[in-house]
Amino acid sequence: METVQLRNPPRRQLKKLDEDSLTKQPEEVFDVLEKLGEGSYGSVYKAIHKETGQIVAIKQVPVESDLQEIIKEISIMQQCDSPHVVKYYGSYFKNTDLWIVMEYCGAGSVSDIIRLRNKTLTEDEIATILQSTLKGLEYLHFMRKIHRDIKAGNILLNTEGHAKLADFGVAGQLTDTMAKRNTVIGTPFWMAPEVIQEIGYNCVADIWSLGITAIEMAEGKPPYADIHPMRAIFMIPTNPPPTFRKPELWSDNFTDFVKQCLVKSPEQRATATQLLQHPFVRSAKGVSILRDLINEAMDVKLKRQESQQREVDQDDEENSEEDEMDSGTMVRAVGDEMGTVRVASTMTDGANTMIEHDDTLPSQLGTMVINAEDEEEEGTMKRRDETMQPAKPSFLEYFEQKEKENQINSFGKSVPGPLKNSSDWKIPQDGDYEFLKSWTVEDLQKRLLALDPMMEQEIEEIRQKYQSKRQPILDAIEAKKRRQQNF
């Protein structure tokens, strides 16, 4: 028995990469197995740590991404040590990519599981996931950190069913001198009203997002998911808190839990610690109840992978009729002895198991970062005169200013009348819309349809404006990065 133990000593668990590992090239330390999906700022891969045999997740981030946000994500993960938060092991620079090595959660995100099974979650399943998520939020908030992007796509499950918070690409740190933040950041449908209004917010902004996430897990998508994100941004602060579409389907405890999360006044909203004592959470069952849905989702994923592999093999067979093949993986170039290697991908976006930004919605929402220039330094805040009326968010002010400029440029050049081209519509300067009564329904519908393209164009102009500011900074960072071997 002793001989067996000596021959097969148990491998130690990876806790953090040591200095020796960090001075090597990442390929010497890890074997990358497959692509898992897309996270904030980069792609996520499944890999194995050669020394311990432990499976890890590696986020590969191009250096042209927002390096400041990436470094912030690393910094926050480094400071966290909780079973309810994804662990960080270390980072590397490799060619034009930053490799961030993190804990691997084999079951993927909650939104992945919903999508793979094409089925929403039961109350028992939701309660168990919320309990772990609240413990993660309680830990983060105790550390004075705000996640700022809580949603089903950022809650990962390991194969045992333990939920962990992930994707800290937009997380923020609160300091003693900065009780509230004033930047609009997060994913639109999950945003708290005070975040959208830019009136300052603290940790309980995550609680609002958690309430929206609870509805998302129950109904498959968050409230307002069927409308344009920019319209949702107008509606969230002005409308009453959202509720279930069919309240009669859900228990009083679950309904009350969501109600406690979705209180519009942040001062009256419950904290993570308080919600852990809520009857809905206290009655949560163990993680074993999640194993069936995890196994079902992983079976669906495996079948999709096998189907995709068959398609790849079939394509290879069809191509072999035209090219000389060697073992199905080597395509010999005509007239060239050495040939050309063809790498066959066995994964597509449909088989992801980590974080995908389409979540459970039909459109790719991603993470919206508005007014991002205030994030360049953690301590920067916008202060408002509290004696003034609540100011409009900066992105709304931009749209209004842009429209005024268009009105001035077009004043006197057009007369309100039937629509000829939906793209040339100008809002009347005097705000008089009486002339609309004389238009046909068809003209009105055309003008309504013209609003979204106009808005998208203005958003793109904003993006280009900030990109022109960011690029010189990114160029300087890349120049410095070239002088480093490892991060």
Swiss-Prot record:
Keywords: Acetylation, Apoptosis, ATP-binding, Coiled coil, Cytoplasm, Kinase, Magnesium, Metal-binding, Nucleotide-binding, Nucleus, Phosphoprotein, Serine/threonine-protein kinase, Transferase. Homodimer; mediated via the coiled-coil region. Interacts with NORE1, which inhibits autoactivation. Interacts with and stabilizes SAV1. Interacts with RASSF1. Interacts with FOXO3. Interacts with RASSF2 (via SARAH domain). Interacts with AR, PKB/AKT1, TNNI3 and SIRT1. Interacts with DLG5 (via PDZ domain 3). Interacts with MARK3 in the presence of DLG5. Interacts with SCRIB in the presence of DLG5. Residues 303-332 are annotated as: Disordered. ATP binds at L36, G37, E38, G39, S40, Y41, G42, S43, V44, K59. SUPFAM superfamilies: Protein kinase-like (PK-like). This is Serine/threonine-protein kinase 4. Changing T175A: No effect on activity. It catalyses: L-seryl-[protein] + ATP = O-phospho-L-seryl-[protein] + ADP + H(+); L-threonyl-[protein] + ATP = O-phospho-L-threonyl-[protein] + ADP + H(+). Stress-activated, pro-apoptotic kinase which, following caspase-cleavage, enters the nucleus and induces chromatin condensation followed by internucleosomal DNA fragmentation. Key component of the Hippo signaling pathway which plays a pivotal role in organ size control and tumor suppression by restricting proliferation and promoting apoptosis. The modification N-acetylmethionine is found at M1. Belongs to the protein kinase superfamily. STE Ser/Thr protein kinase family. STE20 subfamily. Residues 433-480 form the SARAH domain. It comes from Homo sapiens (Human). The modification Phosphotyrosine is found at Y433. GO terms for molecular function: ATP binding; identical protein binding; magnesium ion binding; protein homodimerization activity; protein kinase activity; protein serine kinase activity; protein serine/threonine kinase activator activity; protein serine/threonine kinase activity.
